UniProtKB/Swiss-Prot annotation:
Keywords: Cell cycle, Chaperone, DNA damage, DNA repair, DNA replication, Nucleus. The lineage of its organism: Eukaryota, Metazoa, Chordata, Craniata, Vertebrata. This is Chromatin assembly factor 1 subunit A-A. It comes from Xenopus laevis (African clawed frog). Residues 642-678 are annotated as: Necessary for homodimerization, competence for chromatin assembly. Residues 1-23, 185-377, 552-610, 724-743 are annotated as: Disordered.
Length: 896
């Protein structure tokens, strides 16, 4: 049958074309209304339904999502969870569009006319009751599912493909049995709802490959999957025919065709209902499957929740352990940082301490070096002070003088004893120069020059410079130089000439005779013999008449015997350097200083600081004496010579200061002489005879006793006692005038203190307490051996005395003291006080250094002997003015 043959040809061509490579077509336009793709929705893919496939597998394949095969030819299907229905619609509802129940379109044709596509539509693709169209060799064969459609009828249709129309396409008429068979096949397939997922071309996408084919009756939308499956065709024609199809498909409509179309419409309506029912069943099956999947998922989630709980706890525990470990790690890091910071601080502190210690060490070393330098400097200074006495003072060097540059000679130094020769030794006077000019003008040509020379004698000229003799080089006499302004220049020159050796001109110059072969010393002296043989032209000639050349003077020379060495005498030991230093130190004492044992106490001698200070003073004064020109040198006599009456005035003025003068002593008044003699006649013995009764057995200090005795003398009591002695001595010394109260003399404080220290001692004896005891020999000499102890002196001044009568029943005269100054009775005072007092007195004895044991107060240093002062005043009075010594006011002023 022609229909079957055509179908077989179509299948064969389709099988052959399947082996060809698919290339995706890229269209030059964009989609007008792109459909948004949801995650849960399946992508639009071309689906091809195959036969002999079970409905379950077809349903599974429809529910599975297809991957995009744009870059990969192999397509793999994966099972994805079915998304839930939203508003009663599933994921496939967006692709299904309900067609109207009554459709007058005789056929729905979908043709894939993509460029470079030569794939024909296979017979295995049923269109679910719709017509299947095959395009082969430029003709489009349409197979209708309605059995009543006449096969011989030709229809003219227009197929739109990307703005291109296919006209005059002749569809071959199919037989009625083929259409019925195709309709039955499609009906049976629709009852089972077979759906098969077919792999698309690797080079084409679902949206780009879909094209809308509009017929004259009703167009079909390409968005639904059913329409897509029904609109696929395989182009079996050549590429040139398939790309640009032209022509019209004509069909002759008859009554049979109309009946067929009606039947076809009915059949289509039934197929549509059947298809909707199949869709509902498929939806319910999908829903059940989805519910089962959800239950399985919940069951799995329940199982996983238990395991996840354990895992969660485990993870939580691990997380907590991890957090704890991190916290511990942070704590350890913080602790380590603190320790590092502490160590850094300690290291820094240690470095600072080390630097401080180093600075202190350096400072200490510097101080030590400074102290050592000062000590060394001090030792050197002390040594220099000691050795300075042995060193000769250095004379300042005279400044060097240089000559002026003269001609070709460079300047040279003019040393001591040198002098430059003048350019002209003759000094022309103005008269001589005028005479020379006159002779040059009035020359006489008749007189010969040689004759004039023979007539004249050669002139003599003395020394250009007169040598000066230093006074230090002459040991015999002293030269009076410029320091004495009285001397004149003539006298100085004559004096210098007289200083020389008297016979120097007679004997000539000094000569040195020395030979290297001789052992005897050289001869230095004068030799006034002159030889007639030996002269300057014959220096090696021998004068046998004057000298004996056969005698060897070396044989006659005898060495002198060494003298006695006085450096190491017997009984002397000079090995001790300390003794030498002490002797030298005591020997080199400048004038005006006392020795070590004069005027210095023991404490000052033992004190090293005072000793150093005294040595420095000595060295300083010695240095001043040396530097100020007061040098110690041997005295030299000054020889001036005889001075006559008609001598020069300079010589007379020089000796004027040595002229003799008559000294006349002035007349002294007799009264003043008597006063001086009376003062001198007052001797220590007389004073001591009146002082012993006060001194012997007295417990007071020397100062109190001196004040008491001076007051005793001022009141004239001392003179009254001496009046009888003076009257007894009138026969022997009639010139001594009796002392009256007007000429009272008070001994000085120093004199009384000296008498007390020389003639008494302050000590404690077994019979009596501590007090002053006069020496027994002094008492015998003064015939006062029976003086009581304690003393029975009646005090004139008020003195706080501690004297006490040893025996209360003794009926002697007691010391007249005020009531407040007397001691209390022994019964009213504790004995410990007396013991303490005795102890204090003993300590006073031990600590006293000057011999006045009872003195507790400092003595006045400005004390003078009264007799000397009065003598001086008397001498001044004789020169300047006359003073009446009888005046009491003058006496009071002298005493003060």
């Amino acid at each position: 049958m022609p229909g079957k043959e055509a179908a077989v040809n179509v299948m064969q061509s389709s099988t052959k074309s399947n082996t060809k490579k698919m290339v995706q077509a890229r269209l030059p336009f964009k989609r007008l209304n792109p459909v948004p793709k949801d995650e849960g929705c399946l992508e639009e893919k071309k689906v091809r339904i195959t036969k002999n496939v079970s409905p379950q597998k077809m349903l599974h394949s429809l529910n599975s999502s297809m991957e995009d095969m744009e870059n990969d030819c192999d397509m793999e299907t994966e099972t994805v969870p079915i998304p839930k229905a939203v508003n009663g619609k599933g994921p496939l509802d967006n692709y299904i569009r309900k067609a109207p129940k009554v459709s007058h379109a005789p056929s729905i044709t979908t043709i894939d006319l993509t460029e470079e596509s030569n794939i024909s539509i296979s017979n295995d693709c049923p269109l679910n009751g719709e017509s299947e169209t095959h395009l082969a060799n430029g003709t489009l064969a349409l197979e209708e599912s309605t059995p009543n459609l006449p096969l011989s009828a030709k229809e003219e249709c227009t197929v739109s493909l990307e703005n291109k129309t296919v006209e005059n396409t002749h569809f071959s008429e199919l037989k009625s049995d083929q259409l019925h068979q195709a309709a039955a096949t499609s009906t049976s397939a629709s009852n089972f709802s077979p759906e098969r997922v077919v792999k698309e071309d690797c080079n084409s996408s679902a949206d780009d490959d879909s094209a809308s084919v509009s017929s004259s009756s009703s167009p079909v939308s390409l968005s639904s999957p059913d329409a897509q499956t029904g609109s696929q065709f395989r182009n079996r024609s050549s590429p040139s025919t398939s790309t640009t199809p032209t022509g019209k498909v004509t069909a002759n409509k008859t009554s049979a065709d109309k009946n067929k179309t009606k039947d076809k419409d009915k059949q289509r309506q039934a197929e549509k209902e059947e298809r909707e029912r199949a869709k509902k069943e498929a939806r319910s099956a999908k829903k059940k499957k989805r519910q089962g999947l959800l239950k399985n998922l919940q069951r799995k989630r329940g199982k996983t929740s238990e395991s996840s709980g354990k895992e969660y706890k485990k993870e939580k525990k691990e997380r907590e352990d991890k957090e704890k470990a991190e916290k511990m790690k942070l704590k350890e890091e913080k602790k380590r940082e603190k320790l590092e910071a502490l160590e850094a601080k300690q290291e820094e502190k240690r470095k600072k301490d080390e630097e401080k210690r180093q600075k202190e060490e350096e400072k200490r070393q510097k101080e030590e070096e400074k102290r050592l330098k000062e000590e060394e400097k001090r030792v050197k200074a002390e040594k220099a002070e000691i050795t300075r006495f042995f060193q000769k003072p250095k004379t300042p060097q005279a400044p060097k003088t240089f000559s002026r540059s003269c001609g070709k000679f460079a300047p040279f130094e003019i040393k001591k004893g040198m002098a430059l020769a003048p350019l002209c030794r003759i000094d022309f006077e103005p008269e001589a120069s005028e005479e020379l000019d006159r002779f040059l003008q009035e020359q006489n040509s008749k007189i010969y020059f040689f004759d004039e020379i023979k007539k004249r004698k050669p002139r003599k000229m003395g020394q250009t410079t007169v040598p000066t003799v230093n006074s230090f080089e002459v040991d015999d006499v002293q030269v009076l130089g410029e320091s004495d302004p009285v001397l004149g220049s003539n006298m100085l020159e004559g004096h210098i000439k007289d200083i020389g050796v008297p016979e120097r001109k007679k004997f000539g110059r000094m000569k040195l005779l020395q030979f290297c072969e001789n052992h005897r010393p050289a001869y230095w002296g004068t030799c006034n013999r002159r030889s007639r043989v030996i002269n300057s032209r014959k220096p090696w000639a021998q004068d046998t008449g004057m000298l004996d050349y056969e005698v060897d003077s070396d044989e006659e020379w005898e060495e002198e015997e060494p003298g006695e060495s006085l450096s190491h005498s017997e009984g002397e030991n000079d090995d001790d350097p300390k003794e030498d230093d002490e002797d030298d130190d005591g020997f080199f004492v400048p004038h005006g200083y006392l020795s070590d044992d004069e005027g210095v106490s023991d404490e000052e001698c033992t004190d090293p600081e005072n000793q150093k200070f005294r040595q420095k003073l000595k060295a300083k004064e010695w240095y001043e004496l040396q530097t100020n020109g007061k040098k110690i040198r041997a005295m030299q006599p000054v020889v001036i010579g005889c001075v006559w009456w008609d001598s020069k005035a300079s010589e007379i003025s020089l000796l004027q200061k040595f002229s003799a003068c008559i000294l006349e002593s002035p007349a002294v008044d007799e009264e003043l002489a008597q006063e001086i003699s009376s003062a001198q006649s007052l001797k220590d013995r007389q004073i001591l005879s009146k002082l012993v009764p006060l001194l012997h057995g007295n417990v007071n200090g020397s100062k109190i006793m001196i004040q008491e005795f001076q007051e005793y003398c001022r009141r004239g009591l001392f003179l009254e006692d001496n009046a009888s002695d003076a009257a007894g001595n009138e026969s022997t010394s009639p010139n001594v005038t009796p002392q009256t109260p007007s000429n009272i003399i008070v001994p000085s404080k120093a004199r009384l203190k000296r008498l007390i220290s020389e003639n008494s001692v302050y000590e404690k004896r077994p019979d009596h307490r501590m007090c002053w005891y006069v020496h027994s020999d002094v008492l015998k000499g003064l015939q006062q051996d029976n003086l009581p102890v304690p003393c029975q002196w009646t005090y004139i001044t008020q003195v706080n005395s501690v004297a006490k009568e040893d025996n209360g029943a003794n009926g002697g005269s007691l010391q007249s003291l005020p009531l407040s100054g007397k001691r209390k009775s022994a019964g009213s005072m504790p004995i410990t006080k007396f013991m303490k007092r005795a102890k204090d007195l003993e300590t006073a004895i031990n600590t006293d250094m000057d011999g006045f044991q009872a003195d507790n107060e400092e003595d006045d240093d400005d004390c003078m002997i009264l007799e000397d002062q009065q003598a001086k005043d008397a001498e001044d009075s004789t020169i300047e003015c006359k003073i009446n010594l009888n005046d009491s006011a003058v006496l009071a002023s002298c005493q003060n």
